[in-house]
């Protein structure tokens, strides 16, 4: 029999980290350059990249237009992050809730 492989859970990844690592870095784009291209303040872009600000619907629309992705892609990344973070915040409370049958 094979050995059991223990897989550790990945940390909750903010949408800003994905924006930076998967889109900006490969394009050699800075927060400033992206901000200029999509018409939002550079401080807003920097806060998103640092995980201090959410990607909102308006920003998702601009990012999707610029990168040729869907708005749902960006909002989905943000929602997954938010749900996992909140699940961790209220984990004990959730454990007390009985599933209704």
Tell what function each PLM region has.
Residues 1-7, 101:
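Intrinsically disordered, low-complexity and often Lys/Arg-enriched segments
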Residues 5-28, 76:
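A short, Lys/Arg-rich alpha-helix, primarily the initiator
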Residues 24, 35, 64:
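The alpha-helix within a helix-turn-helix
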Residues 28-47:
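Short alpha-helical DNA-recognition segment
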Residues 41, 52, 67, 78-81:
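The DNA-recognition helices of helix-turn-helix-type DNA-binding domains
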Residues 52-65:
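Short, basic-rich loop-to-helix N-cap that marks the start of a DNA-contacting helix
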Residues 75-101:
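Short, charged recognition helix plus adjacent turn
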């Amino acid at each position: 029999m094979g050995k059991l492989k223990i897989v550790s859970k990945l940390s909750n990844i903010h949408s800003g980290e994905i924006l930076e690592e998967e889109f900006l870095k490969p394009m050699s784009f800075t927060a400033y350059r992206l901000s200029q291209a999509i018409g939002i303040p550079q401080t807003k872009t920097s806060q998103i990249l640092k995980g201090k600000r959410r990607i909102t619907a308006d920003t998702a629309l601009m990012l999707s237009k610029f990168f040729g992705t869907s708005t749902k892609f960006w909002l989905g990344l943000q929602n997954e992050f938010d749900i996992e973070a909140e699940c961790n915040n209220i984990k004990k409370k959730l454990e007390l809730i009985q599933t209704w049958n």
